[in-house]
Amino acid sequence: MKKKLIFGVIVVLLLSSCGFKIVNNKELYNYSIIDVKSSGDSKIGYLLKNNLQVKNEIQNKKIKLDIKIIKNKSIKEKNIKNQITKYEISLNLKVEYNLDFSNESGTFSISKTGSYDVEEKYSQTKNNENNLIAELSNNLVEEIKINLSEITNDL
């Protein structure tokens, strides 16, 4: 019994100071996006540009992006009367990056899918579509930032 207690105390003491530190996300975004070009859907391109172009003058890691946007809108569900009840939107991005600080370049792809309901009024349906596009765009921006931080920090 005493051996188990002593062993437990030793294990706790050794593991409690193992040096693990929670990574602060702000420290990972140590780059500056200086130029964003987009082709494809202009509305989504506008949303992506506005959310990505945060210039941090202090950082010396400057990145240029070229984003190709492919938007697919398809019917997801129909009811018994063959009326459309849900649409599905799929956003596919091909992001080409150019790192000015190391003359390195490459590409990565990101894809997000979501669906929205068809309402009785067209304006409500259009509003649902716009809200979904904004939400998917914000999710894509976060994924782009994560991928860029992994690339710039060699994670």
Language-model features: locations:
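Positively charged n-region of N-terminal signal peptides that target proteins for export
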Residues: M1-K4
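Short, well-ordered alpha-helical segments
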Residues: N127-T152
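Surface-exposed short loop/turn segments
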Residues: K49-N50, K55, N60, D66-N131, ...
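Hydrophobic helical h-region of N-terminal Sec-dependent signal peptides
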Residues: V9-V11
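Extended, charged amphipathic interaction segments
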Residues: I75, D154-L155
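C-terminal motif of bacterial Sec signal peptides marking the signal peptidase cleavage site
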Residues: L14-S17
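Bacterial signal peptide processing site
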Residues: G19-K21
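Post-signal peptide N-terminal segment of mature Sec-exported envelope proteins
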Residues: L28-K49
